[in-house]
């Protein structure tokens, strides 16, 4: 029905293009009028455009500067400050609207200017990545359309070879006129450097500065590159610089400007494929135990071997039953246990290709999944552990726990989590147990739960490493390190590690050095990072299949740009075989046939392992070829350059699909162009389309086909019963192949199923991260304010006023003047004790004002007693150090909350709703802690010379040792807050003297110093 409407009324993309066509005509007419101008006159037109933008925006900028100065005045009253802040918010919106309007007005002239500049540059010789290039690019009409779409903040889908890199220069130039900086995001450093050098002539012609951010650059170099009008770089570099800027100690350490406009090249790779992996800056965990995996590894290896033997037994039983009673339910149950016990078992996978086997297993599984999987436990109970390959989870069974308890010579209970709620309830209800003993017993329950929980988590991660993660598929081992391989591109991801201890488990499995455990210091997801930009756009050859996700997550519309020349590539239906062996043999025979003909062929694979298997088979037949995978990526440019030559055979993982153009050699066009041979369907249709797109660029001929087997991952996990039924009905013999459009469509349906599942994962991740993102914005805004403002006195005094009221309110009901005196001495080091009768008579407001004035007088005396520069340092240090420390702790608490929140679903609660409520409560606690500790530090910090600092640290160390030996009374805890500074030593010759911390409270998650055994936040840390 939809197709009928599209034929009558036209598709969405046709309507989008139709609207833009008149603008393209205007651009071309303007460009023709510029042809008579000299180069200097053309440059002058560019200067004029910039001046018009400046003239439009200058009044708004001047008003903003004036209002900001007023806001910095320490004598400004609250009402006036609120009025100014409201106007600043409105002004920001007006500024963006004015910017959009003037750029829209200047678009035709600017695009015409860029096009004419490209004409002038024709024949210009320059270097790109050390190779001599001659400029021969002038935008076609379809490229102008692509540029207009990008400027509009949308995604341009442009076929391979249509010149996306040149297209980007048009909106980049236009938006660079604002002087706010434009970011062009690529997928790797090589492409960032190449594109910057490749496109720089058109920008240099008009004196626009161009920079590039590379992984090896130092902060000062990065700052210079970000100051340019246009900056190229990768999403990781831009994202990590954002996180590092929000950890900076001084404004001079920050490298980025504001986030105005970004164009993301290969936008589907960056915003979708990378979206499941958050950017994380982590630091080492103090006193972390890295031997925990080594201790349990021998047990797990024996457990895995026992499971393999058990699986082999079930396979044998199934084979016997099938010979005598085909379709026997007992055979189906045995095979289902094999699937749940060792899903990647090669014998099992081969068996599935036999007639009726896949259907038998699927039918049995459906039977046991009925009634909310209530009977699946009957299947799993006979195994040592159960593997759910789709969900990527592993559960230890009672049989597995018994096995481990015998190996470890310990009770099997140590591999089970205690019921904390029941245990605590029993302790609480026992009237015979003294209060102090109750606290101790409850702490023992919590400690037992934590120990067992960690042990079970480590066991689960090791089992995953042995059962679900295969070397040369999900990862490779290079130079004694486990390196993750990108599932979408086949590239190695240096520096990236699996989370939750999984990477350490794989390191233990592979007998390489287990790297230290880390803790998160700063994190952001790709989705939320790119939402920081005022305007975002993207370009790729494959976005249409993910259009709904782009719009739902990023509010980005996808516009398919027509090709300059019609695509004549011939895309054939999939060829389906029963087994991988048959498929590989067919691939080799096809490659041999094509090479004899002279037609170049690119064989696409989904993993390093498959690429090397095919390479061995080709070598055995003496077929000369190149291999491009995660192990040979250093020759990428050279291999890709040769891939379109006559007789060329290239085997490549998906890494050959991004940022590369394969140009045809002499005589290849007549042979049919480049032949794309996919050795397996990827789980994403986009990746398959990207592979096909290597052929047929700019109207070149080409062919593409996929060879598929029922043993492939996609078919095994998500292949439709329909494909299996057709194969069974036709009764295909070994080596036979099916080629039919129905099969191809069924495979695409399976891919769609996986894409939907992955989308739901990414969407769920974003829903969770949105909670943290709102908190991150508040914290980073406060931190940036503390970093950039010269004086923070007014902020400190605002905190003091709120604090004064809180303290007085807390103790007014009981008229506890002694508690007020003790709290103020402890937290602010000031003396204040109201008379009891006066306190009762004057009430909260008047007493709070007295306290505020007393504390203010103390603070003013402190200010007068030291140089202004030192006081500024103290205030900044108080604000920044507390925010950094507490934010790190908060991230750790949020991580812990996320790990266990899904278990709430068993209690008929929505985990996301529970997470939002818990995270909000934690955040309120965090803000309270930050405000109190910032105020406390600002009052109690004094500069000391090095000798005094050493003497003070020694006193504190001795005091801490004494404290450990004491069993302090519960009430006396608040007098023992002594600890040395966590800050590194500073070179006093190179930087101003740093304030030393005279006192520091325990962390919220540390044990309370009172000896109660509770966490500090649940004990004496509850006080304001």
Curated annotation (Swiss-Prot):
Can you list the GO cellular component terms from the UniProt entry?
A: cell envelope Sec protein transport complex; cytosol; plasma membrane
Family statement drawn from the similarity comment of this UniProt entry: Belongs to the SecA family.
User: Entry's PROSITE patterns?
Assistant: SECA, SECA_MOTOR_DEAD
Region entry Disordered: which residue ranges?
970-1024
Catalytic reaction list: ATP + H2O + cellular proteinSide 1 = ADP + phosphate + cellular proteinSide 2
GO molecular function terms listed in the Swiss-Prot or TrEMBL record: ATP binding; metal ion binding; protein-exporting ATPase activity
- For this UniProt entry, which residues form the secretion signal? none
Gene name of this polypeptide: secA
Q: Which residues bind Zn(2+)?
A: 1008, 1010, 1019-1020
HAMAP family registered for this protein in UniProt: SecA
Enzyme class name: translocase
SMART domains listed in its UniProt record: SecA_DEAD, SecA_PP_bind
Q: What is one process in the GO biological process aspect for this record? A: protein import
The record's keywords, sorted A to Z, are: ATP-binding, Cell inner membrane, Cell membrane, Cytoplasm, Membrane, Metal-binding, Nucleotide-binding, Protein transport, Translocase, Translocation, Transport, Zinc
State the taxonomy lineage: Bacteria, Pseudomonadati, Chlorobiota, Chlorobiia, Chlorobiales
**Membrane topology per record:** Peripheral membrane protein
Does the keyword 4Fe-4S belong to this entry? Answer: no
Pfam families noted in UniProt = P-loop_SecA, SEC-C, SecA_DEAD, SecA_PP_bind, SecA_SW
Record EC number:
7.4.2.8
Keyword NAD recorded: no
- Please give the NCBIfam families that the UniProt record associates with this protein: secA
Quote the function comment for this protein: Part of the Sec protein translocase complex. Interacts with the SecYEG preprotein conducting channel. Has a central role in coupling the hydrolysis of ATP to the transfer of proteins into and across the cell membrane, serving as an ATP-driven molecular motor driving the stepwise translocation of polypeptide chains across the membrane.
Relay the cofactor remark from the entry.
May bind 1 zinc ion per subunit.
Q: What is the protein's name according to its record?
A: Protein translocase subunit SecA
Describe its assembly.
Answer: Monomer and homodimer. Part of the essential Sec protein translocation apparatus which comprises SecA, SecYEG and auxiliary proteins SecDF. Other proteins may also be involved.
Cofactor(s) the protein needs: Zn(2+)
Q: State the InterPro entries in the record.
A: Helicase_ATP-bd, Helicase_C-like, P-loop_NTPase, SEC_C_motif, SecA, SecA_CS, SecA_DEAD, SecA_motor_DEAD
